[in-house]
UniProtKB/Swiss-Prot annotation:
Chain intervals for the UniProt region annotation (Leucine-zipper): 137-164
Protein's UniProt name: X-ray repair cross-complementing protein 5
MF terms in GO: ATP binding; damaged DNA binding; DNA helicase activity; double-stranded DNA binding; hydrolase activity; telomeric DNA binding
Top-level taxon of the source organism: Eukaryota
SUPFAM superfamilies: C-terminal domain of Ku80, SPOC domain-like, vWA-like
A Pfam cross-reference name: Ku_C
Domain notes: The VWFA domain interacts with the KBM (Ku-binding motif) found in a number of DNA repair proteins.
Entry keyword set: ATP-binding, DNA damage, DNA recombination, DNA repair, DNA-binding, Helicase, Hydrolase, Nucleotide-binding, Nucleus, Ubl conjugation
EC number assigned by the record: 3.6.4.-
Phenotype when changing residue 275 to R: Does not affect ubiquitination or completion of NHEJ but inhibits release of the protein from DNA and its subsequent proteasomal degradation
Broad class of the protein's primary localization: nucleus
Biased composition (Low complexity): 175-186
Length: 726
């Protein structure tokens, strides 16, 4: 396996006297340069980059470099040699690096950086050697070795970048507002006076000459201002992942096999760093010891060894023991990797709401297999021309469970592949029944209301299209995960400032999550129209449902004593029993259900769930007397649901009950339901129902035709029908 590509980078920072000067109310170039370096290093640390970083400071009060001889290369210090960046380096840049009181030649510092790169990368493999210079160009320099420096940079293939407090663009420097490349935003006036000093102007010419010599006309694209760099580096870099190939054989039937290689295209990114417990005082993980003890559930809490325990599976109220041997025998035994085509279907048969899983895989032909490339290309183009997709069986390896998925043809100018997405099994699909809005005239929108919503949707389009060009106003693929950004921000802050509270969320991150300005402006008028078409009204509190006893109670202005006496006389045993009922029992569940509903502040759904539980318990006995008891409960449930406008709960229950008894030993019970004509609550019985009387009759009718059709579908085994059933 090829090693991960890595670079060697030297950060060469000017810490001379002039770098600490600033205009009133503005940050000095030194502080700006430190911020840029900190952001760059933070990105490298959290991205777990393999790039090695060195730091060279020039303008220091001391000299510490390998080239220092007498009066040469003075006031230049190698602060850190090439190694992976870490929090120690961040802390040093933040707290240790301070401005010096002298100036140093930045070309000498460039030579020291080149020497460090060449010596410390000798015998190692790096994909890139790079030097980044942070300066305000106020330091004097000698041009004696300029041509030698440029020649050595080219020979060693060292790339160069400059980070400055101002632009070096010639037009902008001359006063034009033209912004070219990345050096277009100007942050002038960083020195003690307005504008640039003569030394800085000479430095700009020197930078331009070096960059043009290295990269030609594109050289200035590698010169950045501090302000521009802060904006670009404010987002933490994502963790770099190497593409891991998944070699397999694409099989169609038993005679056609094509070599393929799969790569993950989309998958959920998770934070690799995990939380661990450390001692609050010493901050060391080793000072914490964790022990797990297994005890019996008895008074003595007898301790047992882990080897003397096995797992158990809760099955109702019982626990079924399941040993490791049982688990191994139960596991699905796969033959290994698999990407087998089960069949083909029209792409319109596969709906996007059926996609499941947490990844998208792209299947390519191996680059060194011409026969596989030709065969796979023919399959991809055939699927594309016929508007078809492949339904496939996917197994990652012999330890994995099989998946069923869909493979789409994907053709681009530079490549073509199959895109695999997982599809659900029967148990993965949730079927819900909701009342139709069309059957209730109260909820039918007018033409003006429909038009207002259409206009709002059109105005909130995230695609800008003027007829000639299309632009995505909200590029989600370029949007960083705010969870990661916030986590990295807090970790970095705590690492450098352990005692201070966490900082607020960066404003630039909040701005990224906001609706684009263009969309906000475009939807103002349609929003006003929607508000006018859908006026809000204060919802009145529903009246409490009163019992007949409460409705017909005498309401007179008699003395309290007399009223109390009459209340005592009228206190019935029925109401006393109601007060004692706390749940639906198994003796008289229908009466308990009604008694609970007569109590105030009763949750209908909670009580009905108890009744449904008792109904299923009676059905489990599978005896006629218990069937009749269930019928009585269902009738009571239906009556109370109509009274209290809880139609949906009853209809959902009856539909689920029908599914449960269909094809089982409970068909005798369902025949009783049909004879008693206990069907869904219709719209003629309650306004809250969307079920018509015809639909209620059809609900109780036998469905022989559908059974025959289902049998035919099973015999044919067509993939199109398979997707319809899903």
């Amino acid at each position: 396996m090829a090693r991960a590509a890595k670079s060697a980078v030297v950060l060469c920072m000017d810490v001379g006297l002039a770098m600490s000067h600033s205009n009133q109310g503005k940050e000095s170039p030194f502080e700006q340069a430190k911020k840029v370096m900190m952001l760059f290093l933070q990105r490298q640390v959290f991205a777990e980059s393999k790039d090695e970083i060195a730091v060279v400071l020039y303008g220091t009060d001391t000299t510490d470099n390998a080239l220092a001889r007498e009066d040469q290369y003075e006031n230049i210090s190698v602060h850190r040699h090439l190694m992976l960046p870490d929090f120690d380096l961040l802390e040093q840049i933040e707290n240790v690096v301070e401005p010096g009181s002298v100036q140093a030649d930045f070309l000498d510092a460039l030579i020291v950086s080149m020497d460090l790169l060449q010596k410390e990368t000798l015998g190692k493999k790096y994909t890139r050697l790079h030097i980044a210079v942070f300066s305000d160009l106020s330091s004097p320099f000698s041009v004696d070795q300029l041509e030698v420096i440029i020649a050595n940079l080219k020979k060693a293939e060292i790339t160069l970048q400059f980070f400055l407090p101002f632009s070096v663009d010639e037009e902008e420097f001359g006063g034009s507002s033209n912004n070219r490349g990345n050096a277009g935003s100007s942050d002038r006036g960083c020195g003690p006076g307005k504008g640039l000093s003569d030394q800085q102007k000479e430095g700009i010419e020197m930078v331009r000459k070096i960059m043009f010599s290295l990269d030609g006309e594109e050289g200035l694209s590698e010169v950045f201002t501090f302000r521009d760099s802060l904006e670009r580096l404010s987002i933490f870099k994502k963790i770099e992942r190497r593409p891991m190939p998944w070699p397999c054989q694409l099989t169609v039937g038993s005679s056609l096999s094509i070599r393929i290689v799969g790569y993950k295209s989309v998958t959920e990114e998770k934070v690799k760093k995990t939380w661990t417990h450390i001692d609050a005082k010493t901050h060391k993980k080793e000072d914490i010891k964790k022990e797990t003890v297994y005890c019996l559930n008895n008074d003595e809490e007898t301790e047992v060894e882990k080897d003397d325990t096995i797992q158990g599976f809760r099955y109702g109220s019982d626990i079924v023991p399941f040993s490791k041997v049982d688990q191994e025998q139960m596991k699905y035994k796969s033959e290994g990797k698999c990407f087998a085509v089960l069949g083909f279907t029209k792409s319109s048969m596969v709906l996007s709401n059926q996609f499941v899983g947490n990844q998208v895989i792209r299947m390519f032909a191996p680059s060194d297999d011409e026969a596989a490339s030709v065969a796979l290309s023919a399959l991809i183009h055939a699927l594309d021309e016929m508007d078809m997709v492949a339904i496939v069986r996917y197994v990652y390896d012999r330890r994995s469970n099989p998946q069923v998925g869909v493979a789409f043809p994907h053709i681009k100018d530079k490549y073509e592949c199959l895109v695999y997405v997982q599809l659900p099994f029967m148990e993965d699909i949730r079927q819900y029944l909701f009342s139709s809005l069309k059957n209730n005239k109260k909820f039918t929108p007018t033409e003006s209301q429909n038009s207002a919503i259409d206009s709002l949707i059109d105005s909130m389009s995230l695609i800008y299209d003027d007829g000639e060009t299309k632009e995505d106003l909200f590029k989600t693929s370029k949007l960083p995960n705010p969870q990661f950004q916030r986590l990295f921000q807090c970790l970095q802050h705590k690492a450098l400032n352990p005692e201070s509270p966490l900082p607020p969320i960066d404003q630039h991150l909040l701005d990224m999550l906001e609706t684009p300005v263009e969309v906000k402006e475009a939807c103002m008028a349609p929003l006003a129209t929607v508000k006018a078409c859908f006026p809000l009204q204060e919802a009145t509190k529903r009246k409490e449902v009163k019992t007949a006893d409460e409705i017909f109670t005498k309401k007179t202005d008699e003395p309290d004593a007399k009223k109390l006496k009459e209340d005592d006389e009228g206190f019935s045993l029925l109401r006393l029993a109601d007060g004692n009922v706390t749940s639906v029992g198994s003796v008289n569940p229908d009466q308990d259900f009604q008694a609970l509903l007569r109590q105030k502040n009763t949750d209908f759904k909670h009580v009905s769930d108890q009744l449904i539980k008792r109904i299923y318990e009676c059905l489990d006995v599978k005896q006629t007397q218990y069937y009749m008891k269930s019928i009585l409960c269902i009738k009571t449930f239906r009556e109370e649901a109509i009274k209290l406008s809880q139609v949906r709960l009853f209809n959902d229950f009856l539909q689920l009950l029908k599914q449960k008894v269909d094809g089982s030993a409970l068909m005798e019970f369902w025949d009783i339901i049909v004879q008693e004509e206990i069907s869904l609550i219709t719209s003629s019985e309650s306004k809250g129902s969307s079920v018509t009387p015809e639909e209620a009759k059809q609900f109780l009718a036998q469905k022989e035709e559908k059974v025959e059709e289902a049998a035919m579908m099973e015999d044919e085994g067509d993939v199109d029908d398979l997707l319809d059933m899903m």
